[in-house]
Amino acid sequence: MGYIKFQKDRKFEIVPIGRVAIDFNPIDINRPLSESKTFKKYLGGSPANIAVGLSRLGKKVGFIGKVSKDQFGKFVVDYFDNEGIDTSQIKYAENGESLGLTFTEIASPTESSILMYRNGIADLELDVNEIDEEYIKNTKAIVISGTALAKSPSREAALKALELAKKNDTIVIFDVDYREYNWKNKDEIAIYYSIVGKQSDIVMGSREEFDLMESLIVKEKSTDEESAKRWLGFGNKIVVIKHGKEGSTAYTNDRKSYKIKPFPVKLLKSFGGGDAYASAFIYGILEEWDIMDALEFGSASAAMLVASHSCSEDMPTVKEINEFIKEKKEQYGEMIARG
């Protein structure tokens, strides 16, 4: 069933907005970050990873963001170009802002952490004047990242994109993507998350992220069902609440729910799965698949990523995901993720 009605004949199918960074993942893993000496550089940042993921899946992808005017910024633009992602709306920071840097720790397959450098960064300098209405008018959907709301002027730029999307019948997907950096306090988080969450068509986040978004509008923490009912009531068509290794559930505006579990894999790291999940799930929605099929596709892609060293570099193709699902079902049974 198609819960989302996308406009036809648009140049782009999806345009993420917001954070792009550089990830440094340790080569010498299974030790604390303080002991790692060798790292490999990758493109990073949830919106950027989602863009790469959807491009690998064959979608026509654009991107709205700002990068540093240096070698790292050039690396991002060149990487996107090589992936077939339109870079016409990626701006360069003019006042010396740097690209966000992320150093990851892979202490063990289940113990991973992230150290981010997010001061004076380019992506939060995206300005309202750099949001082009024609670009948003020419895409089926935009993805707004919660990190884009953390600070002005990026905050206002994201809100302008939201308003222009609603004006032009462009679908809005809100990926909550909470990162503690750059926010002043939890009330600020709740205010701006709610503004976008109340106007989006699809909202995706972890249980903890929904708790943050709802902290000013409820007295006590909600159950998943209560949160889903609330955000569907605001007008969302699909609400996805994630619980990590416990799986996730999609709630739809016809009062149905669909639960998916992770596919079994040998973990390498415990981060990166969320972006792969989002890109593959969104792919299924763009293809107007049944919700359960889209969830299964997302869960499979996430499993593949947590078994891989990078996030962006290891984003799978449609063929690779289908082969992975087929292999796991042959090994564990047809309902391995759906049971």
Curated annotation (Swiss-Prot):
A biological-process GO annotation: inositol catabolic process
Transferase found in the keyword field: yes
Pathway given in the UniProt record: Polyol metabolism; myo-inositol degradation into acetyl-CoA; acetyl-CoA from myo-inositol: step 5/7
CDD domains: KdgK (cd01166)
EC number annotated for this UniProt entry: 2.7.1.92
Catalytic reaction list: 5-dehydro-2-deoxy-D-gluconate + ATP = 6-phospho-5-dehydro-2-deoxy-D-gluconate + ADP + H(+)
Example GO molecular function: ATP binding
Keyword list, A-Z: ATP-binding, Kinase, Nucleotide-binding, Transferase
Family: Belongs to the carbohydrate kinase PfkB family.
Role description: Catalyzes the phosphorylation of 5-dehydro-2-deoxy-D-gluconate (2-deoxy-5-keto-D-gluconate or DKG) to 6-phospho-5-dehydro-2-deoxy-D-gluconate (DKGP).
PANTHER family named in the record: 5-DEHYDRO-2-DEOXYGLUCONOKINASE (PTHR43085:SF49), HEXOKINASE FAMILY MEMBER (PTHR43085)
Name by which UniProt lists this protein: 5-dehydro-2-deoxygluconokinase
Organism in which the protein naturally occurs: Clostridium botulinum (strain Eklund 17B / Type B)
